[in-house]
Amino acid sequence: MSGTGNRSVVTRRSGNGLIDGVLVGAHWDDEIIHYSFSLSANAYGDIDHPFEILNAAQEAAVHFALSAAQGPAASAGFSFEGFTAQAVNFLGRTDEGNAHIRYGIDPELDGGRVSDFPGDIVGTGEADDGDVWFGGQLSWAGSETYAQAGNAHWHIALHETGHALGLKHGHQDYNGFDALPFNQDSYEFTVMTYRTFVGSSPHTLRHWQEVGDVDFPQTFMILDIAALQYMYGANFTINADDTVYSWTPDSGDTFVNGEVGIDAAGHVIFATLWDGGGFDTYDLSAYSDDLIIDLTPGGGSIFSADQLSHLGQDNFASANIYNAWQYQGDARSLIEMAIGGDGHDHFTGNDADNVFYGGRGDDVFDGGGGADNRVTYDGAREAYTILRHDDGSLTVSHDIWGTDTLINIDHIIFSKTETWLDVDDILSEVSEPVISRKIDVTGLSAEGFEESHEYDDAAPIDDFYM
């Protein structure tokens, strides 16, 4: 029986309302969390509804949500085991054993549910703690039960697994824990809320029905990851080497070192990324759109408006990919490098040693923090015109490659002639007023997130290449 004999502990408040808003008040406290796919109703003793086994796609969705070992290696970092320090073990398709979390289908259920949380919160007895049920029907998402990243059945796997690990609904006050703050209560922040967009109603099916068929979150989102790491610690061993994450405009898939890590049901990209360490890259070289690439913790990057999630009515997600928060200020999870495309791209660095490749277009580079931020160009010095402005920014122009704006940059390097320029020594080659281009950077680096950002005092070096 699921909860019998498995140890749970009380979850104390973190003091951060964005984390506490999804905590239920208890979580598992065993060295290994075991899960299984039940084969019959006999696994449960006395249940008051019919039973069916999961199909292969639902099993794959559960593996993606929980295990770093059961799915493709490229998917490991998106799983609970991949971003927390908690070990997870799959017991198999069985009615035996003492799994913490068991999965089955209730063909009469519309949606999904968990029988009880860790710690017997509902109070029905510990035997059903962690039992997850997929519904045999979804009146709000059609009759298809095939789960794939971004569709409703995939979302159920993430949402109900979150409950089984110790997360509550973000939109509800429950068990002494308040709901999420209004501005962070949506799918952009958590899979645990019923609010698809900020301000939507959590009490009707209407908004769910308006979400695009492939527009649900593809992974646990920022607040889910932060809350689960608060309870179970963080994993810095998954993708701890140099990892390249890439995307294309004609697919919703996320590629990890060239392999599919998120096999999307459609063209939408809607996920949060945690990385364990190494020198890591966001590669957007396939795009010709005007990219907004934000590497800050909690920040969001926009690759293509056509690939933004439709969250109901006229509301779309604020980004395609979001960065997880740092865990206790540890910089190993930061992304260090970004490669732009052929559009007019905007890059925002973090506190790591950043390297940016701009590509074509009129790009904007903001080095952020650091004492020695660099921009490197492949051409010779004489091919570029540099203007310095009263606000400290620079514009670097090339007849073919475009005009770039440099902010918080200390050195410019022209690799062909190995010329190194100190920005403090640069005088404008032509006297011009400040050139400014307003960038609408829409992401999650909002004031509401600042309380969870912890930064190191070290002064990094940011390198920008074009």
Question: Can you say where each PLM-predicted feature lies in the sequence?
Answer:
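RTX-like calcium-binding, glycine/aspartate-rich low-complexity repeat tracts
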Residues: 1-364, 368-466
